């Protein structure tokens, strides 16, 4: 389907943290008919994988949840001097990335690398609820890869990054 239509449909699904079932259902229903993908659901996280025997695997991931809704559902189109904008909860963080990943997952049947598409719950809240962490704990094989891309918004730039802590003692 049309990427803009998919994007708007996803934005119009309320998916506040801990209440992602409707959007996880929509993601699963979008992916399931495509025979080139093995689709697995864990809670309200959905993982789709190709199995083409490629030498490398790329993991492309994004979270399904949003912060609470504040009178911004349903979405609407706002006309500005530089173009039309979809306005609504999650348009930037991160349903735009989810829409792009979903569109690619269903259309990219023969990629040069195997691909894992991970759509996970509960990123916007405390780490103990994080769906990506749960997938890594329950089924690490599902997100094993050689390289990963997180579809978080970056103002249109590719950014390298990592998450971690450093502990030291000053004497």
What do the predicted segments below correspond to?
Residues 19, 23, 93, 158, ...:
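Short, contiguous, pocket-lining structural segments
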Residues 1-59, 64-69:
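N-terminal helical capping/dimerization or prosegment-like subdomains
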Residues 98-167:
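Acidic/histidine-rich catalytic neighborhood of metal-dependent amide-processing enzymes
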Residues 5-6, 65, 93, 123-124, ...:
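Acidic active-site catalytic centers that drive phospho-/nucleotidyl reactions
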Residues 57-119, 131:
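Active-site metal-coordination/substrate-binding segment of hydrolases
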